[in-house]
Amino acid sequence: MLKGAILGTLAGLLVVGAAQAQPVVYTWTGYGKNVPGSSKCPTYKMVIDVTVDGDSVKGKFQQEGRPERGFETTLGKNGAIKTAAIVGGGNMMDVIGQIKEGDSKIKLYGYCEFEGPLTKKAGS
């Protein structure tokens, strides 16, 4: 009987622990920087949202007036993010960043460079 009570308590703690692990959403909004061959990037406004759920990372980004795009990856060593995202015309953007308490950041590099610190969204 004692064994059943202990197992029940442990199972309850696992359920509570799992329920407390909520995804964390980070965001950045800013303007681009020119890369070789571009000249209009400082006029392009970008919104980037990154959701971290354990080691799973899902991002979405949208340049003002353009369709929303996305990427998925897993956190690397020391919270590193590194992947690529397909944008219009089949072109690619490199996605590089870091999720680290007090020092989270993101960079999209391709037709322009969009880079900045990620801040936690309210409620995350």
Listing of model-derived features with the role each one plays in the protein:
Residues M1-T9:
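Bacterial N-terminal signal peptides that target proteins for export
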Residues V16-A21:
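Sec/Tat signal peptide C-region and signal peptidase I cleavage site
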Residues Q22-S124:
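Central antiparallel beta-sheet cores of small beta-barrel/beta-sandwich binding domains
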